């Protein structure tokens, strides 16, 4: 790696670390008792096929400021929103980690671009989890138990599920952006949201092979309320 590339990466690392530190400082006061994921209605459901999954995660209506917040079981205020985001990041990271393990065992992904996507996004999603956990500190919610079925061992199912999960992440972050009070939290959320959008675009292109896969919902993103996100995630059956 040349010196310019090293410098750029160092700058990015410093920005990420600073955002996480700033966000963590906003949690210094008060305490939050977190409920279990089941209280949020996340557990249960059956694993569905890629087409049905994508259909379940299509955008709903836009939301206004102060509406569509996560259930109280995630925590109060900004803590609840970041724990809501962390739950989605846990899900995504676990999905890609399992797919990576299966890829090492069976080489189920044959397409070279999809292999690169898996490697890159696995790193990113684990970084997002670490980032949010550091920002939340002792208030971070625990990782849920998951079951991805065959979606992490079939190339076609993997790509379809990646499209669904990444687009849901984008809709979830945009849905909560106006609900965040702390500037440090807004910076943290936006730094992840933009990367999730890039993941979704690449996954969509891998799935369709057409430019339309990059922006499946058109030129504007439609925010999801927390309830819409949780309903869509529950339908996947991935969270146990």
Regions found by a protein language model. Name each.
Residues 46-56:
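Short, glycine/alanine-rich hydrophobic alpha-helices that insert into or span membranes
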Residues 2-32, 55-240:
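All-alpha RGS (Regulator of G-protein Signaling) helical domain and cognate RGS-like helical scaffolds
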Residues 25-48:
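N-terminal secretory signal peptides and thylakoid transit peptides that target proteins
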């Amino acid at each position: 790696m040349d010196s310019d590339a090293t410098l750029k990466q160092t700058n990015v690392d410093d920005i990420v670390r600073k955002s996480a530190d700033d966000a963590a400082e906003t949690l210094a006061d008060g305490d939050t008792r977190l409920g279990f994921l089941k209280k949020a209605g996340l557990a249960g459901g059956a694993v569905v096929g890629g087409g049905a999954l994508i259909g379940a995660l299509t955008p709903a209506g836009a939301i206004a400021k102060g509406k569509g917040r996560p259930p109280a079981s995630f925590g109060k205020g900004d803590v609840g929103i970041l724990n809501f985001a962390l739950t989605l990041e846990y899900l995504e990271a676990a999905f890609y980690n399992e797919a990576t393990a299966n890829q090492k065992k069976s080489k189920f992904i044959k397409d070279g671009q999809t292999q690169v996507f898996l490697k890159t996004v696995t790193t990113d999603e684990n970084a997002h989890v670490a980032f949010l956990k550091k920002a939340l500190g002792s208030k971070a919610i625990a990782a849920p138990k998951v079951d991805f079925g065959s979606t992490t061992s079939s190339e076609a199912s993997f790509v379809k599920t990646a499209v669904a999960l990444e687009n849901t992440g984008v809709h979830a972050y945009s849905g909560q952006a106006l609900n965040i009070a702390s500037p440090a939290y807004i910076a943290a959320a936006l730094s992840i949201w933009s990367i999730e959008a890039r993941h979704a675009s690449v996954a969509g292109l891998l799935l369709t092979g057409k430019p339309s896969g990059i922006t499946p919902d058109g030129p504007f993103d439609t925010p999801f309320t927390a309830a819409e996100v949780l309903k869509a995630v529950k339908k996947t059956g991935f969270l146990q």
